């Protein structure tokens, strides 16, 4: 049985036409579907709202995926040398906005120099699945102007464990808590 559609030309907007289902659609017992009315503007608004909801959902999801417990704070307009090493697995520290990809190999120290000329927050991830829970290792980097960085430096200072020799090789990792936000 074909579905009959009744067009309502008495709509206030000139470019839209209301559509009312006047016959039984696919579900016979559903009175709500029988009495549905659509016009182009309300349909467009509905699509627009759903699109905004999906965009907001994806932004919220991406924020959750990039959330970190600590933030590395660095100054801008300064050459920064990063010395990295690993004890157990190969790591690949990747921040695409800065063009930085640093590979850490177990038992070796790698040196990388980079320069940040713009202030802001930068996000990255571990670029390789290199061990347990490394499929999602977010990185948050805060680049501050040099004057603001000096104020931050005076407030937080260097971690005490950087100046002491540690018998436990993993103790220095926990010493960086004060250095990061």
UniProtKB/Swiss-Prot annotation:
The keyword Electron transport applies. Mg(2+) binds at residue 128. PROSITE patterns: COX2_CUA (PS50857). GO terms for biological process: ATP synthesis coupled electron transport. SUPFAM superfamilies: Cupredoxins. Binds a dinuclear copper A center per subunit. It holds the Pfam family COX2. Component of the cytochrome c oxidase (complex IV, CIV), a multisubunit enzyme composed of a catalytic core of 3 subunits and several supernumerary subunits. The complex exists as a monomer or a dimer and forms supercomplexes (SCs) in the inner mitochondrial membrane with ubiquinol-cytochrome c oxidoreductase (cytochrome b-c1 complex, complex III, CIII). Component of the cytochrome c oxidase, the last enzyme in the mitochondrial electron transport chain which drives oxidative phosphorylation. The respiratory chain contains 3 multisubunit complexes succinate dehydrogenase (complex II, CII), ubiquinol-cytochrome c oxidoreductase (cytochrome b-c1 complex, complex III, CIII) and cytochrome c oxidase (complex IV, CIV), that cooperate to transfer electrons derived from NADH and succinate to molecular oxygen, creating an electrochemical gradient over the inner membrane that drives transmembrane transport and the ATP synthase. This is Cytochrome c oxidase subunit 2.
